[in-house]
């Protein structure tokens, strides 16, 4: 794999020689994020042709929708995707070697009077992606967008009455799962602003939208009903039980034929503890089959390795400043996938490791990979992450890992890491490039 210590003639370097950029903003976005993206593709075993294709798509179809390049003194749209408002995040399914990235589409009218709450940019972005990838279907995209994001009238009402006081205004984002030369597209919806406009809770908006959908697509009804019953029991007993109430925070779905698409409901869990995670995993004891129990054993193993601090936590109301070193811990989260013709929702739990030491997290993951036969990942993961930030004191960093997700299906663990993706590789590439994350930067290594 090509690393920052030995750049050679890697895909990123060659494309950087070829590409022209229509603006300095896009040029900065490319050189800030593509080194890590290219290394991740290489590390995950994508062939050279697929690496060029995915990086080319990223440059042509994604970077134009990332907005102004963030600096400490520049006004910009803040995205809920990351704690400092960056609109892009790389993630890696370490056990399946699948690269993924998520972004909140932003354009020139985002945050202006023409689109105060960034409702419109995603429409243009998703249409462009649909032109280059076969199989994208927008039926459920359109349905959930109508149900969970502001319409023109609601946006005008919120704006004219100044009803939105919060920093966090994200309504939707897209994700691409890169599978060989192709990609699968997903959409995520955050109905917080819709909640302000309608007076309905975010939780009710999400569950009501899925209920309506399940009346048309009854093959997801059994799993949805099990999830509804579990959440109802948890929330009914929240005041007397050690576990707190569960609240839906966001929803996602695959942008494919609705007969094959999955719906995922994400629940915010404010109590971080192993017992709560076990409850989320088993749906309060309803899932007790052999595969679930095997997954539970691995979940407990990860909990022991990662050493996530326990506590009852609130999600922060605002963002961290760009470059600010976190001194916080986030609450937990789980999502439940509703598969067609499957009576049980499938859980995926999230270890909230943001703010913890990245070197220690990398070491813990390496042990897990070694124990379960993921030898290449055990050998390469920490090296890849260090080489993505070669000018930083890796032992001191505590913001590279945001979450670690875990699920278990077909007798196999699925573990993904969600990573800080900004000022990667040999940044700054140019003398005039801004540096925001400098708290743990060492003397710059020689590039000779």
From Swiss-Prot:
Positions annotated to bind L-tryptophan: 80-81, 89, 190, 249
GO biological process, one term: ergot alkaloid biosynthetic process
GO MF term set: tryptophan dimethylallyltransferase activity
Record keywords, A-Z: Alkaloid metabolism, Transferase
Metabolic or biological pathway, per its Swiss-Prot or TrEMBL entry: Alkaloid biosynthesis; ergot alkaloid biosynthesis
Reactions performed catalytically: L-tryptophan + dimethylallyl diphosphate = 4-(3-methylbut-2-enyl)-L-tryptophan + diphosphate
Residues binding substrate, per UniProt: 100, 186, 188, 262, 264, 266, 348, 350, 414, 418
General function of this protein: Tryptophan dimethylallyltransferase; part of the gene cluster that mediates the biosynthesis of fungal ergot alkaloid. DmaW catalyzes the first step of ergot alkaloid biosynthesis by condensing dimethylallyl diphosphate (DMAP) and tryptophan to form 4-dimethylallyl-L-tryptophan. The second step is catalyzed by the methyltransferase easF that methylates 4-dimethylallyl-L-tryptophan in the presence of S-adenosyl-L-methionine, resulting in the formation of 4-dimethylallyl-L-abrine.
Subunit structure: Homodimer.
Family stated for the protein in its record: Belongs to the tryptophan dimethylallyltransferase family.
Protein's recorded name: Tryptophan dimethylallyltransferase 1
Organism (species): Claviceps purpurea (Ergot fungus)
């Amino acid at each position: 794999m090509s690393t920052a210590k030995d750049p050679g003639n890697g895909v990123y370097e060659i494309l950087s020689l070829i590409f022209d950029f229509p603006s300095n903003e896009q040029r900065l976005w490319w050189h800030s994020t593509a080194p890590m993206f290219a290394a991740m593709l290489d590390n995950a075993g994508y062939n050279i042709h697929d690496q060029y294709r995915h990086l080319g798509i990223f440059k042509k179809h994604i970077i134009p929708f990332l907005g102004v390049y963030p600096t400490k003194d520049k006004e910009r749209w803040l995205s809920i995707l990351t704690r400092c408002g960056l609109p892009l995040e790389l993630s890696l399914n370490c056990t399946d070697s699948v690269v993924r990235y998520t972004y909140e589409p932003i354009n020139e009218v985002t945050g202006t009077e023409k689109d105060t709450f960034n409702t419109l940019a995603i429409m243009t972005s998703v249409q462009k992606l649909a032109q280059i990838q076969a199989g994208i279907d927008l039926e459920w995209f359109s349905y959930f967008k109508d149900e969970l994001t502001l319409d023109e009238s609601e946006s005008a009402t919120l704006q004219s009455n100044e009803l939105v006081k919060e920093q966090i205004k994200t309504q939707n984002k897209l994700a691409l799962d890169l599978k060989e030369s192709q990609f699968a597209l997903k959409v995520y919806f955050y109905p917080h602003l819709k909640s302000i406009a309608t007076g309905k809770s975010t939780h009710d908006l999400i569950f009501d939208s899925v209920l309506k959908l399940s009346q048309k697509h009854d093959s997801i009804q059994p799993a949805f009903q099990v999830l509804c019953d579990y959440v109802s029991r948890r929330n009914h007993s929240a005041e007397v039980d050690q576990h707190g109430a569960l609240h839906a925070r966001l929803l996602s779905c695959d942008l494919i034929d609705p007969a094959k698409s999955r719906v995922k409901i994400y629940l915010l869990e404010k109590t971080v503890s192993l017992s709560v995670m076990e409850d989320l995993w088993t749906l309060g004891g309803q899932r007790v089959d052999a595969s679930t129990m095997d997954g539970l054993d691995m979940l407990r193993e990860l909990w022991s390795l990662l050493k996530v601090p326990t506590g009852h936590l609130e999600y922060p109301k605002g963002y961290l400043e760009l470059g600010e070193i976190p001194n916080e811990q986030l609450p937990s989260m789980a999502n439940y996938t509703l598969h067609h013709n499957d009576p049980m929702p499938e859980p995926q739990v999230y270890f909230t490791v943001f703010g913890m030491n990245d070197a220690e997290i990398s070491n813990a993951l390496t042990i897990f990979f070694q124990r379960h036969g993921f030898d290449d990942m055990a050998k390469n993961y920490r090296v890849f992450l260090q080489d993505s930030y070669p000018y930083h004191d890796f032992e001191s960093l505590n913001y590279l890992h945001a979450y670690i997700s875990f699920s278990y299906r077909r007798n196999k663990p699925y573990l993904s890491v969600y990573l800080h993706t900004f000022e990667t590789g040999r940044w700054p590439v140019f003398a005039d490039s801004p540096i925001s994350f400098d708290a743990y930067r060492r003397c710059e290594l020689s590039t000779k």
